Amino acid sequence: MEIWYAEIINIGNEILTGRTINTNASHIARRLTSLGYTVRRITVVRDEIEEIVSAFREAINRRPRIIISTGGLGPTYDDKTNEGLAKALNIELELNEIAYKMLLEKYSKLNIEITEERKKMAIMPKGSIPVENNAGVAPGILIVYQGITILATPGVPKEMEDVLENFIKKYLKDRPSVKYLETSFLLEGVMESTIAPYVKQLVKKYDLYIKTHPKGQELSKPILEIQIAGSSENEAEIKERIQKALEELKEIGVKLGGTIIQS
């Protein structure tokens, strides 16, 4: 089974100072995983050109199928993703006419003039395709470089989600053939350390990702969410493996004195 790797780059000082929770990374990771990609790395960098350049170049050197970034596409002085991406790819920046028309249409409806700051949101690496942003103003930037699809999205979560979905629907034609499935259940009364060796055995037996997520306290009233996940080109086959592992894990949990409280 061929693995299609993906990487995520989040750009913004506000993430690194802890002011903003990085919900964008989790949303993109879930979305890409649902499409069959394996997200290999999530990188967070400051709003600094050299940091942005380094993040893109390092990701490109690892040769993922797709790189998605968030943040830095707005009109302010510290929005530098377009410049950083262009420098990382050694491609000149240009005023993208399609993106500029998108901006003109949005601002003209409100009788707002296009300033240099607003015009900046249409400046992209040469050869880029602007991706519509129906939840805001700044369009996403789509470019294919050395066979790697790169999508830069805004940092505002609603705008990022809109641009991401527009990209998936309109432009992401070549996708992994694998199907990712997962399920989970809650087990009460069994310590994570007690069930750990059984989980290890089942991971090897079924070739699945099985993860215990503690929801209670190990030494008082332990509650575990047990996640079972896997990928395969054969959906029926992966469903069967997950179901067998699920049933076996529940049996083990009960034998260890636990109670299934949610399945």
Swiss-Prot record:
* CDD domains named in the record: cinA
Source species, domain of life:
Archaea
What name does the UniProt record give this protein? Protein STK_14130
What PANTHER family does the record tag this protein with?
NICOTINAMIDE-NUCLEOTIDE AMIDOHYDROLASE PNCC, NMN AMIDOHYDROLASE-LIKE PROTEIN YFAY
InterPro entries found in the cross-reference section: CinA, CinA_Arc, MoaB/Mog-like_dom_sf, MoaB/Mog_dom
| Family designation | Belongs to the CinA family.
Question: Which species?
Answer: Sulfurisphaera tokodaii (strain DSM 16993 / JCM 10545 / NBRC 100140 / 7)
